[in-house]
Amino acid sequence: MFTGIINGTATIVYIEKKKKKYRYTVELPSNLSKNLKLGDSISHNGCCLTVKLINNSFIICDVIQETLKSTNLGILNIGDSINIERSIKYGDEIGGHIISGHVMNTAEISKMSKSDNNCVIWLKMNNMSLMKYIFYKGFICVDGISLTVNDIIKNEFCVNIIPYTFLFTTIKDKKNGSLVNIEIDFYTQTIVDTTERLINNNLKSLYD
């Protein structure tokens, strides 16, 4: 589990591309590699990956084909930065919202507006069926960052980025057309899906 509060960014130093998976070598800042163990979960751009090997500040994680297809990890290159969050432990503060690290799809940045104290990003889902889970002032996880939906117009929604988040995450490297990972809030998805199922069952019973 994660909270969407990014601990820092890391750099991809090597990518081994195999037929059914990629193997990433990532260099972590020293504060993020402290007490890290084999088998630990760590969020890469919002994707929960398992630490397979550790060598000082370098870690290796495998990314399977399904994850490569549904996230932006498959288009990353050596030298790219990624958002990193260590998994939460019992008693840790939850500064954002509960995030599983199971990215559902990507969204494309359609517009970025920057000012001295704010950055507004408009996003367009690549899987439009996920838009039914987007609500005004609802939670959304973008590249591992816990954010709030600030507006919705047709098939696009926007989020606001505060200066701290802009400077200390990969958001500062984004531009129009960039792909970001999206995880819908679990509780929102559960409510929407349950309500839909109940309505459909009730409608079906009326005509049976």
Swiss-Prot record:
Residues at which 2,4-dihydroxypteridine 1 binds: G4, I5, I6, S146, L147, T148, N160, I161, I162, P163, Y164, T165
Renumbered ranges of Lumazine-binding repeats: 1-97, 98-195
Protein's UniProt keywords contain Acyltransferase: no
Protein name as catalogued: Riboflavin synthase
UniProt keyword annotations, A-Z: Repeat, Riboflavin biosynthesis, Transferase
Keyword Cytoplasm: no
Subunit structure and binding partners: Homotrimer.
GO molecular function terms listed in the Swiss-Prot or TrEMBL record: riboflavin synthase activity
Role summary: Catalyzes the dismutation of two molecules of 6,7-dimethyl-8-ribityllumazine, resulting in the formation of riboflavin and 5-amino-6-(D-ribitylamino)uracil.
Pathways per UniProt: Cofactor biosynthesis; riboflavin biosynthesis; riboflavin from 2-hydroxy-3-oxobutyl phosphate and 5-amino-6-(D-ribitylamino)uracil: step 2/2
NCBIfam families tied to this protein: PRK09289.1 (NF006767), PRK13020.1 (NF009566), ribE (TIGR00187)
Positions with a binding annotation for 2,4-dihydroxypteridine 2: C48, L49, T50, D62, V63, I64, Q65, E66, T67, G101, H102, V103, K137
InterPro entries xref list: ATP_synth_asu-like_sf, Lumazine-bd, Lumazine-bd_dom, Riboflavin_synthase-like_b-brl
EC number, as in UniProt: 2.5.1.9
GO BP, sorted A to Z: riboflavin biosynthetic process
